[in-house]
């Protein structure tokens, strides 16, 4: 079992039960999944760059990434139906905890002038979204093998009913939030 899953079972669950006065153990907020997604943008036209981006995300996540296609044509964006528009990978169970541990303890501390993740990334239903400007902060990524640097969006889905519960859950996991608002 991963370090964060042990921490969740031993310390975080009891803290959440105490803080929110939860009677039913099935109502304790927990992590559901983590989705890492990248918009391909202009890179979608070059199959080699798109595949390189997918390989990079697969390395970071530890699971094969999927290239997503447009569901319908949009002339304003010069996109046709079936045209590749992004890359995503969904992590659950052990891989989810391993990725979150790597993100918190290795990747985010490597960011220059990192002041914490914004607190306004919650959606009102207990899920948290934030973006990273580049993929080079992860130790698996080798600078020489990257054709183009790109950012990524990370969504942490929880079973929490509201933002307050989700914030406390992520804070107890050790997610570094920005000080202040």
Swiss-Prot record:
SUPFAM superfamilies: RL5-like
Keywords for this protein: Ribonucleoprotein, Ribosomal protein, RNA-binding, rRNA-binding, tRNA-binding
InterPro entries: Ribosomal_uL5, Ribosomal_uL5_bac-type, Ribosomal_uL5_C, Ribosomal_uL5_CS, Ribosomal_uL5_dom_sf, Ribosomal_uL5_N
Example GO biological process: translation
Gene3D superfamilies: 3.30.1440.10
GO CC terms: ribonucleoprotein complex; ribosome
MF terms in GO: rRNA binding; structural constituent of ribosome; tRNA binding
Pfam families attached to this UniProt entry: Ribosomal_L5, Ribosomal_L5_C
Assigned protein family: Belongs to the universal ribosomal protein uL5 family.
Role according to the record: This is one of the proteins that bind and probably mediate the attachment of the 5S RNA into the large ribosomal subunit, where it forms part of the central protuberance. In the 70S ribosome it contacts protein S13 of the 30S subunit (bridge B1b), connecting the 2 subunits; this bridge is implicated in subunit movement. Contacts the P site tRNA; the 5S rRNA and some of its associated proteins might help stabilize positioning of ribosome-bound tRNAs.
Subunit structure: Part of the 50S ribosomal subunit; part of the 5S rRNA/L5/L18/L25 subcomplex. Contacts the 5S rRNA and the P site tRNA. Forms a bridge to the 30S subunit in the 70S ribosome.
Database matches in NCBIfam families: PRK00010.1
UniProt name for this protein: Large ribosomal subunit protein uL5
Organism, scientific name: Campylobacter concisus (strain 13826)
Designated gene of the protein: rplE
């Amino acid at each position: 079992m991963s370090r964060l899953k042990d921490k969740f079972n031993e310390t975080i669950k009891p803290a959440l039960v105490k803080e929110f006065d939860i009677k039913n153990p099935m109502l304790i907020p927990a992590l559901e999944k983590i989705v890492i997604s990248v918009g391909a943008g202009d890179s979608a036209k070059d199959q080699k760059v798109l595949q390189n981006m997918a390989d990079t995300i697969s390395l970071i996540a530890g699971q094969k990434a999927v290239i997503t296609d447009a569901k319908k044509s949009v002339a304003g964006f010069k996109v046709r139906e079936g045209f590749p528009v992004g890359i995503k990978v969904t992590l659950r169970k052990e891989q989810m905890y391993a990725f979150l541990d790597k993100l918190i303890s290795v990747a985010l501390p490597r960011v220059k002038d990192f002041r914490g993740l914004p607190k306004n990334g919650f959606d009102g239903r207990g899920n948290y979204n934030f973006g990273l400007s580049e993929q080079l902060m992860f130790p698996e990524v080798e600078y020489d093998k990257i054709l183009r640097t790109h950012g990524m969006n990370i969504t942490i889905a929880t079973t929490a009913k509201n933002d307050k519960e989700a914030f406390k859950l992520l804070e107890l996991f050790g997610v570094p939030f920005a000080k202040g608002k």
